[in-house]
Amino acid sequence: MKQVQVHPPNPHWPHAFEAEAAQVSRILGDNVVHIHHIGSTAIPNIYAKPVIDMLAEVSNIDRVDACNAAMAALGYTALGEYGLPGRRYFRKDNAEGVRTHHVHIFLAGSPEVIRHLAFRDFMRANPDCAQQYSDLKRALAAQYPNDIDSYMDGKDEFVKAMEKRAMEEQALS
């Protein structure tokens, strides 16, 4: 089983995102509309698994498949849709086999893009909710140190509730 470790907030995470996003953007070329930093490392002052999550919006999702070899040269494994229709998913491990990056690619403006960005922006704008999320992640990592599936399942209800609030707030603005 994969070990679950959450780390204290790291001021390097945004810089790590910027550096990697620049390389991914070069690979995607003129197909890329925008690359966003998502996931817990994109939310200030919370504990996170030290994995940089990126969400790339593209103008043509089918053109992404032609980039698989270039992404592999950058160290990524292409996993196709990986359970989410319309997505292209890549992950990257370091030399020790530890996960360092995820790249989720969707058609620009898709519902998945809107959902991910709404959650991130809601958590950034609501530090109390972000702190609750951080505390939950730490508790789950302590409870399930060797069970990533139980850790993820434990976050699910909270994340869905926050996504719902985020989408409701977005609809009102």
Walk through the language-model features, giving the residues of each.
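Conserved catalytic core of two-metal-ion nucleotidyltransferases
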Residues: 76-111
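Short, flexible turn/loop "capping" segments at secondary-structure junctions
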Residues: 1, 45-49, 114
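Short amphipathic alpha-helices in soluble, non-transmembrane regions
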Residues: 66-74
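Catalytic cores of NTP-dependent nucleotidyl/adenyl transfer enzymes across multiple folds
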Residues: 109-173
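Short histidine-centered catalytic/ligand-binding loop motif
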Residues: 5-11, 56, 119-123
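Active-site nucleotide-donor binding segment shared across nucleotidyl transfer reactions
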Residues: 23-65
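Helical scaffold of the NTase/Pol beta-like nucleotidyltransferase catalytic core
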Residues: 1-36, 160
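Histidine-centered active-site/metal-ligand motif
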Residues: 36-37, 101-104, 116, 151
